[in-house]
A protein has these predicted regions:
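Thiol-/selenol-based redox modules, centered on thioredoxin-like
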Residues: 163-222
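Conserved redox-active cysteine motifs that mediate thiol-disulfide chemistry
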Residues: 81-98
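Residue-level detector of Asp-centered blade-edge/turn motifs that repeat once per structural unit
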Residues: 225-229, 280-283, 338-341, 392-395, ...
């Protein structure tokens, strides 16, 4: 859970039909009392009128037309306060989908996008994320946090329930709230149905949604260049597949059938779900962070097969520090790096680094307390912030830590330490070149080492920055005038940087010597990229 000012929201307890569950609380500013409901109490109905949505805000999945609370009377309304850089917010999406399926048109879910980062305030960027994650309910751009403040939200995600009479029932923060919300929503629908006050008819915005772009690549998240073997691996994330091409763009193979799923097999039958980071263990073995499958996949480039080595598709908060890899349930792995016989994993969902040993087939906690933060120190004491990019110079592991807009340096082996090269806090971000603590990045998702320098995908600034790890000096290398749109990853080969230019649905190629940026044209004579 993302916490504003570091203050966690303490949930009260409530009794519902004799079952003790984590409870809702009243929104700050509406009422100071916790919501406590016992089995013998007749009603869950709220008492405080829900604050109206301000006029003239941008709406998504409504054709641009605003939604009013008045027209939602007769429905249970669930407000989901989120920000699109927050991984915990995306963990809530499957719960929202389950709730919508349970209650159909009796429940209306409204996404209230209240941005943390400056770039997240842009409606066009929110639209891209709505597409990437398949969000089909209405979303309002609460860019100045007016709705957030009116409802007293304090952390991302926060979920607020409004009853069919238009009154606030309560709210709860953090992921993992499905059981509570399901009980409360179900009870409200039962209560108001008995009073003849439920409107089960679909509303006017039902079925309105954005159209997905028809492009060869769809929101590619990461890229891996292999200069020695003239290969380029592309995580074609929203097509749920890996594309293998030459460095000049000739498509050699497509790995995965393009449908979301967790299935092993040959290239044509294997399935991925929103794959991200990749790394080569050797010329014949590619590892993939299969992010939405909460799995690590191994691709045999000779046999042309895909095998799951860790994860079973379920996401949990990992409390054990070591376990057999195949039986492990992971938490949103976003990047991988193979070094000296060990696979390092950026476990973004719980702000830690893990490791996989192919010889023992075990997975172990490597670094991070699990607390979201930017604390340096020993491997066990250090904290990370949604780590999403990994690289190495052979001596150190370098980590792109986006929620702290930071770059971290991590030693290898027992007794190693974690040091911050760039970044000062979870809410310290911007676009400032300079040295050390004066530098400001904005939600950097990618990093690669090349020719003595660290190149950073400064994602929300839509730039590529270069960092000298010894002096901590950062300078802008490319971008800033529309060349990129939220690049998620990058990799180098020879004189070129290859950039996953995510929102432009392309791979960009940057000449390191001249700085010239061009689109990598994919040559696909066998039509391997065609979607089924």
């Amino acid at each position: 859970m993302k916490i504003v000012r570091g203050i966690a929201i303490a949930a009260s307890l409530m009794l519902l039909a004799g079952v003790m569950v984590a409870g809702l609380r009243w929104a700050t500013g509406l009422d100071s009392l916790p919501l406590s409901v016992a089995a013998d109490m007749p009603s869950l109905a709220g008492k405080q009128p829900a604050p109206a949505f301000p006029a003239e805000l941008d709406w998504i999945n409504t054709g641009g037309r605003p939604v009013t609370l008045q027209e939602l009377r007769g429905k249970v309304v669930l407000l989901d306060f989120w920000t699109y850089g927050c991984i915990n917010c995306f963990h809530v999406i499957p719960d929202l989908e389950r709730l919508q399926k349970n209650y159909g048109s009796k429940l209306v879910i409204i996404g209230v996008h209240s941005a943390k980062f400056a770039t997240e305030r842009k409606t066009a960027h929110i639209e891209s994320v709505v597409l990437r994650y398949g969000i089909d309910h209405p979303v309002v751009n609460d860019k100045d946090m007016q709705i957030w403040n009116a409802y007293g939200a304090e952390g991302w995600p926060t979920l607020t329930v409004i009853d069919p009479a238009g009154n606030v029932v309560g709210q709860v923060s953090g992921e993992g709230q499905y059981e509570l919300l399901n009980k409360v929503i179900g009870s409200l629908i039962k209560e108001f149905s008995a009073r003849g006050l439920i409107n089960a008819k679909p509303l006017w915005f039902s079925g309105i949604h954005l159209e997905m772009p028809k492009t060869a690549l769809l929101y590619p998240g990461k890229v891996l260049a292999d200069a020695e073997h003239d290969r380029l691996f592309i995580a074609d994330s929203n097509h749920d597949r890996i594309v293998m091409a030459t460095l000049s763009g000739k498509v050699l193979a497509v790995i995965g059938d393009g449908k979301p799923g967790l299935r092993d097999g040959d290239y044509a039958h294997a399935q991925f779900h929103y794959p991200q980071g990749m790394t080569l263990a050797n010329a014949d073995t590619l590892y993939v962070a299969d992010t939405d499958n909460n799995a690590i996949r191994k691709i045999d480039l000779v046999k042309r097969t895909v095998t799951t080595i860790a994860g079973d598709g379920k996401r949990i908060y990992m409390t054990r520090t070591t376990m057999p890899a195949r039986n492990a349930e992971l938490n949103t792995p976003w990047a991988v790096l193979f070094h000296d016989g060990v696979l390092y994993i950026a476990m973004a969902g719980q702000h830690q680094l893990w490791s996989y040993d192919p010889l023992t087939n075990s997975i172990d906690l490597y670094a991070g307390s699990g607390r979201e933060g930017i604390d340096d120190g020993s491997l066990a004491q250090a904290s990370f912030a949604q780590s999403s990019g990994l690289t190495t110079d052979g001596k150190y592991l370098y980590v792109a830590d986006p929620e702290a807009s930071a770059v971290r340096q991590v030693g290898f082996g027992p007794g190693a330490q974690v040091h911050t090269l760039v970044g000062t806090g979870l809410f310290d971000f911007g676009d400032v070149d300079g040295v050390g603590d004066t530098v400001r990045l904005q939600h950097d998702l990618g990093i690669t080492w090349h020719a003595g320098q660290l190149y950073i995908a400064d994602t929300y600034n839509s730039k590529i920055k270069v960092l000298d790890a010894k002096t901590r000096r950062v300078t802008t290398f490319a971008g800033g005038t529309g060349e990129f749109d939220e690049p998620g990853g990058l990799s180098a080969a020879g004189d070129y940087l290859y950039v996953a230019d995510t929102n432009h649905n392309r791979i960009a190629r940057v000449d390191i010597k001249s700085g010239r940026i061009s689109s990598l044209k994919l040559d696909d004579p066998r039509h391997l990229l065609a979607q089924p």
